[in-house]
Amino acid sequence: MPVNLKGRSFLTLKDFTPDEIRYMLNLAADLKAKKRAGIRGNLLAGKNIVLLFEKTSTRTRCAFEVAAYDEGAHVTFLDSKSSQMGKKETMVDTAKVLGRFFDGIEYRGYDQKVVEGLAANAGVPVWNGLTDVDHPTQALADILTLMENTKKPLNKCKLVFCGDTRNNVAYCLMYICAKLGMHYVGWGPKELAPAADVVAYCKEVAKETGAIVEYGEDRALLKGADALYTDIWASMGEEDKIPERVKQLTPYKVTGEVLAATENSDCIFLHCLPSFHDFDTTMAASQKELSYDIREVTDEVFLSPNSKVFDEAENRMHTIKAVMVATIGNV
């Protein structure tokens, strides 16, 4: 049966079947090939989309804007300073207004309930650009990058997330790996283990797809990985958590030794970015002066041929384009 996602919101990968996820990945690969060939599309011609940002980003904003422009859409950007949502206007009212103006709404912020509320009230597709508990467009880009760098079918691939295994990126990777029958490992300290309800959901899905979902502290879990993944240990505004995070997560830093422990010379390294892989940022340098090394990955890995982080960043644009085309496109 053909996949039809027209009119659907994209809030979490939990809402989509394995076939629907594969459809979006294959569509992204096709759109990427056409862009590389210089074929300009018009699949979003006449469409108006709004980007609603409560939390800043480089990749998400640029990916949505370029993807939309590539296919002929018009884009409006609203941040917390240029929107009254939650201040002088309720989220419900904002959703109803934006739904009258736009064909699709992207939201990037904090609370998953906000993006769900927008989708429930806007009357048009709403796309999750990131919340505190999910980052579904990122997971699509991650898996597309893995597809481009392995000869294995996805259900034979093993992905290991290193570090804080209960953050939003780890969760969206758990969901997509479970849906696609992959082997997911969360390698990190037990005090930062994924929430029980997330694990239970993924293991229930795995019963249908044949996926393996596990987590733990043992370095033996790295063996056979096709991809190692990590994320920063603390974001801006979380400086007070750095001493504790450095103590907890330094044993799970992605180093050359950790990469070698996979025993797979073709294992790729992935990261959602931004990354602290050196001390050339203000935050990393200032923390180094306080004797805290906040690098979650070393340059030995980040700059190695195994690292596909910039291909992965580009793939944000192609997968986001696929989501928009699939849900509001002229197809």
What are these regions (language model features)?
Residues G38, N42-M147:
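Phosphate/diphosphate ligand-binding glycine-rich loop within oxidoreductases
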Residues L44-I49, N155-C157, D266:
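Phosphate-coordination loops involved in phosphoryl transfer and adenosine-cofactor binding
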